[in-house]
UniProtKB/Swiss-Prot annotation:
Substrate binds at residues 90-94, 144, 193, 220. NCBIfam families: Q_tRNA_tgt (TIGR00430), tgt_general (TIGR00449). Homodimer. Within each dimer, one monomer is responsible for RNA recognition and catalysis, while the other monomer binds to the replacement base PreQ1. Its cofactor is Zn(2+). It comes from Cupriavidus pinatubonensis (strain JMP 134 / LMG 1197). This is Queuine tRNA-ribosyltransferase. Gene3D superfamilies: Queuine tRNA-ribosyltransferase-like. Pathway: tRNA modification; tRNA-queuosine biosynthesis. Zn(2+) binds at residues 308, 310, 313, 339. Binds 1 zinc ion per subunit. The keyword Ribonucleoprotein does not apply.
Length: 376
């Protein structure tokens, strides 16, 4: 089940509300990534406290470990991981295609060697839908071929991108058919592919639109292409997506990318950046980024961001976070992650408010000015 309400718009920016089987999601929204059923360094309680409304799980990795039998014992992923709000799962396609020479693609699906134990495995649109039905994720993603930016060290040609995109379209139909055969009560999103070519993106969207998905994602971006190419494709595709369905930009990105995505008409985002960077001591603030490992923070009594209300900023100094990072304490990764995810979620709250008040353009200018100012 999915119900999408478009509350208001401001230019191409959209303020919406998505109702799913496990709850309501206010959009634009950022979705923390929980690859193995866990958002790294965060408990479900902490995710609730910072205002997370929906998280991601990874179909490919959860299929391999712990395995569907374990998840099925818990009647789905929600009970297994102790999270009662919505979950989106990807199809496993991106991970399979990231295996490179370890996999073989045919019309039927993909054969590959398990990265866990080397076993020969097979994943297809039908199997992906079956796995995601067992996971009982609120939003299921179609099985697709993520068109790489580079093939053999050079940008993918129009012909290569077209072949990949049309395979994904055929797999989209099979995903939709299997989703319906399983009588899955959740929502299914199609994924627009086509590489860096606008005409192929248009062809992909036209084909997906005939299948009447519950929502539409933009895939195949942030896969190594120059930022200007990413923005060109994003700004072409996002405004053309069906206005009455949620729009999801997969795997993107920086705070600046999120705001640019909203301006283009995107409603949903995910990225490992805030959690991965947190563990590496790279922290996002209203006034630019802080590399907490740098010696400049060794004796700094200030919080990371004096405008931030997260647990980390309310209770700890830059000096303490610097110390934790330098000595490798687990608490450092946890406090850093709490802050970075809070920052991303608070950014989306401010974006939503600015769209509601029809001042998103002003917000965007102030956001860019603040981030460019840098921390002091």
């Amino acid at each position: 089940m999915l119900n999408f309400e478009l509350i208001t718009t401001d230019g191409n920016a959209r303020r919406g509300r998505v109702t799913l089987n496990h709850g309501v999601v206010e959009t634009p929204i950022f979705m923390p990534v929980g690859t193995y059923g866990s958002v790294k360094a965060m408990s479900p309680l902490e995710l609730n406290e910072i205002g997370a409304e929906i998280i991601l799980g990874n179909t490919f990795h959860l299929w391999l470990r712990p395995g569907l039998d374990v998840v099925n014992t818990h009647e789905g992923l929600h009970r297994f991981i102790g999270w009662d709000k919505p979950i989106l799962t990807d199809s496993g396609g991106f991970q399979v295609f990231s295996l490179g020479d370890l996999r073989k693609i045919t019309e039927d699906g993909v054969t590959f060697a398990s990265p866990v134990n080397g076993d020969k495995l097979f994943l297809s649109p039908e199997i992906s839908m079956q796995i995601q039905r067992t996971l009982n994720s609120d939003i299921v993603m179609q099985f697709d071929e993520c068109t790489p930016y580079e093939i053999e060290g050079r940008p993918a040609t129009h012909e290569e991108a077209a072949k990949s995109m049309r395979m994904s379209l055929r797999w989209a139909k099979r995903s939709r058919d299997e989703f319906e055969r399983l009588a899955n009560p959740n929502a299914l999103f199609g994924i627009v592919q086509g590489g860096m070519f606008e005409d192929l993106r248009d062809e992909s969207l036209a084909g997906l639109s005939e299948l009447d998905f519950h929502g539409f994602a933009i895939g195949g971006l942030s896969v190594g292409e120059p930022k200007e190419d990413m923005m060109r494709v994003l700004e072409h595709v996002a405004p053309r997506l069906p206005a009455d369905k949620p729009h999801y930009l997969m795997g993107v990105g920086t705070p600046e990318d999120l705001v640019a995505g909203v301006a283009a008409g995107v409603d949903m985002f995910d990225c490992v950046m805030p959690t991965r960077n947190a563990r590496n001591g790279w922290l996002f603030t209203r006034y630019g980024d802080v590399k907490i490992r740098n010696a400049a923070h060794r004796n700094d009594p200030r919080p990371l961001d004096e405008s931030c209300a997260c647990y980390t900023c309310r209770n700890f100094s830059r000096a303490y976070l610097h110390h934790l990072h330098r000595v490798g304490e687990i608490l450092g990764a946890r406090l850093n992650t709490i802050h970075n995810l809070h920052y991303y979620l608070q950014l989306m709250r401010e974006v939503r408010e600015s769209i509601e008040q029809h001042r998103f353009s002003d917000f965007r200018r102030q956001f860019a000015s603040d981030r460019a100012r840098g921390t002091r």
